[in-house]
Amino acid sequence: RGLGDVYKRQAVENNALFAINGDFYGNSERSIVIRNGIKYRDDVNDADVCVLFTDGTMQTYSPSEYDSDAVIAKGAWQAWNFGPALLDGSGNVLETFNTTKYLNSSNPRSAIGCVSAGHYIFVTVDGRNEGYSKGATLSELAAIMSDEGCMSAFNLDGGKSAMMYFNNSIVNAPDGGGRDLSDIIYIGG
């Protein structure tokens, strides 16, 4: 079994035309997990939260702003707890990011952004591959999302998790061949 096999299997089993890695919630017992409107885990940690609502809008929250009952009442459909948030909700790059200095350096990355309700941008940046790609800093990733017209954007799990799938194939060059993931974000075919 090769790395990424679980990722590809999840995509195939869900009839995904497109998929990107999620927040790798399976790597932590303390996190927020809302999938398809069902709250599975509600343990706020020190990471930002991104919520996709049933009306197609997307909003990011700092740990101190996040209120589980309020987002469920507002129609939370999916929630990812990794981050950080990249944009301020008006398309502007944040001046500081809620993360450690290490995570701010150039790395393979994946992000989800929202231009308007139901209009999303997904980005995966390869990295740690000398002569091919060094990756992106959070500021660089945020600038990409802003340049693409996103109002809000969120950094998903990166590193070996940064994978993008389209039409039955992984279409990027994941660091170390990728890793098996607990979750993906997908668009059905």
Where are these regions (language model features)?
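A generic secondary-structure signal marking the coil-to-beta-strand transition
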Residues: 15-18, 183
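Alpha/propeptide regions of enzymes that mature by internal proteolysis
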Residues: 17, 21, 153-155
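Short, small-residue-biased leader/transition segments that mark boundaries at the very start
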Residues: 2-7
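Active-site-adjacent helix-turn-beta-strand microarchitecture at beta-sheet edges
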Residues: 23-103
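Acidic carboxylate-rich catalytic motifs and surrounding loops in phosphoryl-/glycosyl-chemistry enzymes
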Residues: 1, 21-24
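Non-catalytic positions within long, well-ordered alpha-helices that form the structural scaffold/packing
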Residues: 11-12, 146
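Residue-level marker of positions within ordered structural domains that often coincide
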Residues: 12, 24, 117
